[in-house]
Every structure is written in C-alpha cells, then in structure tokens.
Amino acid sequence: MPRRKDIYMIIGIMGAMPDEVDQLCEKLENVTVEPYGGVEYHRGTLAGKQVVVCCAGMGKANAAATTQVLITRYGAEKIIFSGIAGNMTSKIGIGDVVIGKTVLYHDAQLDMICQNPPYLKAYAGDPALIAAAEKACAEAGVKALTGKIATGDLFVGDSETKAAIEAKCAPDCVEMEGAAVSQIAAKNDVPCVILRAMSDNADEDGHEVLVVKKFSIAEYVATATRIVAAMVEAL
C-alpha cells in the first residue's frame, strides 16, 4: 500500500505508556481519534504542524508495529519517540535526557538482523531531529546527552544484567522500544529520533524508584511535552 500523502508534512509522535503521550494529546487542535490495531491514533495540529500521536505499548513488537502503521496508514514523514529509560552512564543523572545518536538492540544477534533491509546493526538518529532536540532541551534547561541507546525486551533492574549489557555495547541508557522504532523508520527511509529521560539507574533500586514515584513521571511528561512541542514547531 503506498504511503498516504497530505499537503503538509505529517510528524508521528510516539510513547510506550499513556502517561508519556497524554499531555501532548491534550495540546492538539482539530483532533480526530482512530482506533486501529489496538492503538488509538490522535491526529491533529501542534504548533501549526500536522501530527499523529499514539501510545504504542511496551516492547519491541508493539513499537515496530505502531511505527509501520504511522508511516503506511498516516503518512508520517518524521518520527519522534519520547519516553523513560534506565541510566547506564555517569555523565548524566536521574531526570536528564539521552538523545539517540545511535540506537541498537542489546538482546539480538546483530550479524543476523543486518542481513535484511535496512542492512544495519545499529540505527542513526536523524541529524536534523537531533539538532532540534538538543536546541529544545537547552531552551528548556534540561541537561541532555546525545549518545547511544540500547533496546531489549526486558526491564533492566539488576547489576548483573546491567554489567552484561555494558560489556556488550556500552550504551548511555537502556530501554524497550527505541531500536525497533528506529529499525522500521530506517527500513522506510523515514527520519527518526529517540528521546529518553532517565528514570532509574538500571539496577536493583530501579523497580522501587518507579513504584514509589521517586522519579516523577508527571514531571518528566510535562518537560517532554514542552521539548517535543518545541521540536515540532522548529521543523
């Protein structure tokens, strides 16, 4: 099915959890909502640009499927994914942001995955989207690191798993969707960037940090909404 085209560029904006996209949905104007494949797609305008905002659900399969729907059904020509992640570096702390310059899987055999389109072991964030994210973070007063994001289908919450991932690919943070989004975007030649705020340190305290709300999802979401809205306005 050919990608649907509209008069103006359409930007796809994704999160894995409802909290990560709800505030953005509230900011949309001229909104229509379409349930499709178990996901609600909110189409409208943000900062005068046409966007489609959705909650993909957690994990690689959900992320990949939703990315393809955004591109094929809604004609998304740029993809922004925003969410939380486990910190893997001493360069930043809880609440700081990693902008994905490089995104890859930590739980996959990369030399096999790269035998199919887009023939890559790792996926590069789009330079223009990275620049827009860096500018938006700076203007919002948010400390940001442009670096490496690792993706796998597990919540990393113990030192042994964290050390194994560090030894394998030395990422700046670890999460569950970014590489899948980036792989499908690359396969379709669609520019993409992954933004992650650090919610925990990917160790034994990670689950407690999230459960007892030491890291405020609401606070991050408000900041992320400002960052994404500023990015959209700049595109």
Please provide the spans of the model-predicted regions.
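Short, conserved "active-site rim" segments that organize catalytic pockets and cofactor/ligand binding
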Residues: 9-28, 50
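Glycine-rich phosphate- or other oxyanion-binding loops that anchor nucleotides, phosphorylated ligands
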Residues: 8-10, 34-235
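Short, Lys/Arg-enriched N-terminal segments with co-localized hydrophobic residues
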Residues: 1-8
